Design a protein with these regions (language model features):
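Non-DNA-binding regulatory cores of transcription-related proteins
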Residues: 67-133
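Key DNA-contact positions within bacterial/archaeal DNA-binding proteins
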Residues: 39
């Protein structure tokens, strides 16, 4: 499993906004601090605004801020928003059951791996990330 650039950047943006909280932060400032292009930053912000992780105010003096407290921004939820699924194999993330599930000797291992991954990321918040070096 590999987390996409979008997922990693979304987490960095949320940590940045949390660290520079209290007021509105211009998107260009976050982009400059995080080394993210303006175009890519706009895509990430649109996704985060849509799901309420970020609030945006347009116009003079506008900018962005967290849409909820950093301790309510769960890494697992954010990664599922940006990645779609944290399942390590396609058969666990599709709507239809895998035709080989009944005879597959590895499906149990993949399910457990997915459970461990979700439990791990669901136990971390943006506030926790602010404490790490």
């Amino acid at each position: 499993m590999m987390i996409s650039t979008r997922g990693r950047y979304a987490l960095r943006v949320l940590v940045d906004l949390a660290e520079h909280g209290g007021g509105l932060v211009p998107m260009k400032d976050v982009a400059a601090r995080q080394g993210i292009s303006k175009k890519y930053m706009e895509q990430i912000m649109a996704l985060l605004v849509r799901d309420g992780y970020v609030e945006g105010v347009h116009g003079k003096g506008g900018g962005y801020r967290l849409g909820r407290p950093s301790e309510q921004c769960v890494v697992g939820d954010i990664l599922r928003l940006t990645e779609g699924s944290l399942a390590p194999v396609a058969c666990l993330s599709c709507d239809e059951p895998c035709e080989r599930a009944g005879s597959c000797r590895t499906v149990g291992m993949w399910r457990r791996f997915e459970e461990i991954t979700n439990e791990y990321f669901d136990g971390i918040t943006v506030k926790d990330l602010m404490k790490t070096e």
